C-alpha cells in the first residue's frame, strides 16, 4: 500500500484534488481516503457525498487541535486510521491522507506518508512559492491550484513558476484548476510514475 499525504492551507483545494483523484483512479486501483479536520468530519462528509467511493473507504479523523501535530509530531490517530483501513481492505493499493488546512510548514511524518503533495492556490498571491517553508521546499509534488483566478487576484503565473523552480530545485510542480480538471492528468501521471512505479 502506498500512502500519499495531501496538505496545504485552508481552501487551497486539497479536498477537491482528492475527490478528483478518487473519481479518476478508483476504477483502476484499490483506494481509500483518510481526512483530518480539527473539530468536525466535514471533509470526510463531503467525500462521502461527492466521491465515487463507498463510505467505508473514507475515514474522518477529528484532530481536536493543531492540524500539523496530527500528521507529524503525534500521528497516532492517523496511524490508527491507516491500520483500520488496511484491516478493512487488505489489498489496498493507494491511500490518500488529507491533512487539516495548515500553513506552509506542514509536512507528514514519514511513518504516515510515503509521498507528500502540497497544494497552494494562486488566490494567496504569486509570492507564496518564494515564501518557502517545508511544504513548498520539501514536498514530493507541489500543486499550484486555481490558476483560473490569477487575472482576478493579480497573480503572475510566470513569477510563481520562476519562484517554484528556485525554491524547489529539481522537484516537480504542476499548475492546476482542479475544478475544471485542468492539470489533473499531470497529477495522476506523477502519482502513477513516482508513487505506483508505473511507466
From Swiss-Prot:
Instruction: Detail which positions bind GTP.
Output: 8-15
Return the CDD domains for the record. UreG
Its primary localisation, in coarse terms, equals cytoplasm
Any single Pfam family the record assigns to this protein: cobW
| Protein encoded by which gene | ureG
Question: Which terms in the Gene Ontology molecular function aspect does this entry carry?
Answer: GTP binding; GTPase activity; nickel cation binding
Alphabetized, the UniProt keywords read: Chaperone, Cytoplasm, GTP-binding, Nickel insertion, Nucleotide-binding
UniProt-recorded name of the protein: Urease accessory protein UreG
One GO process term, biological-process aspect: urea catabolic process
Family matches, as InterPro entries: CobW/HypB/UreG_nucleotide-bd, P-loop_NTPase, UreG
The protein's assembly and partners: Homodimer. UreH, UreF and UreG form a complex that acts as a GTP-hydrolysis-dependent molecular chaperone, activating the urease apoprotein by helping to assemble the nickel containing metallocenter of UreC. The UreE protein probably delivers the nickel.
**So which residues are the signal peptide here?**
none
State the organism's lineage.
Bacteria, Pseudomonadati, Campylobacterota, Epsilonproteobacteria, Campylobacterales
Stored HAMAP family: UreG (MF_01389)
Where are its TM segments located?
Answer: none
Natural source organism: Helicobacter pylori (strain P12)
Record's subcellular location: Cytoplasm
Per the entry, what this protein does is: Facilitates the functional incorporation of the urease nickel metallocenter. This process requires GTP hydrolysis, probably effectuated by UreG.
Q: Could you name the Gene Ontology cellular component terms for this entry?
A: cytoplasm
Amino acid at each position: 500500500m502506498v500512502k500519499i499525504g495531501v496538505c496545504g492551507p485552508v481552501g487551497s483545494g486539497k479536498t477537491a484534488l482528492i475527490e478528483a483523484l478518487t473519481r479518476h483512479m478508483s476504477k483502476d486501483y484499490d483506494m481509500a481516503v483518510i481526512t483530518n479536520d480539527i473539530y468536525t468530519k466535514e471533509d470526510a462528509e463531503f467525500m462521502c457525498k461527492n466521491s465515487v467511493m463507498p463510505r467505508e473507504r473514507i475515514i474522518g479523523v477529528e484532530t481536536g487541535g493543531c492540524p500539523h501535530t496530527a500528521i507529524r509530531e503525534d500521528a497516532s490517530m492517523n496511524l490508527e486510521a491507516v491500520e483500520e483501513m488496511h484491516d478493512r481492505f487488505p489489498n489496498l493499493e493507494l491511500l490518500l491522507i488529507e491533512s487539516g488546512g495548515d500553513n506552509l510548514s506542514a509536512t507528514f511524518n514519514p511513518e504516515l506518508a510515503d509521498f507528500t503533495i502540497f497544494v497552494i492556490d494562486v488566490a494567496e498571491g504569486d509570492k507564496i512559492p518564494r515564501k518557502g517553508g517545508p511544504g513548498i521546499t520539501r514536498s514530493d509534488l507541489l500543486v499550484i491550484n486555481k490558476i483560473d483566478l490569477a487575472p482576478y487576484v493579480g497573480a503572475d503565473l510566470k513569477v510563481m513558476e520562476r519562484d517554484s523552480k528556485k525554491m524547489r530545485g529539481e522537484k516537480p510542480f504542476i499548475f492546476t484548476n482542479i475544478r475544471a480538471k485542468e492539470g489533473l492528468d499531470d497529477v495522476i501521471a506523477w502519482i502513477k510514475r513516482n508513487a505506483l512505479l508505473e511507466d
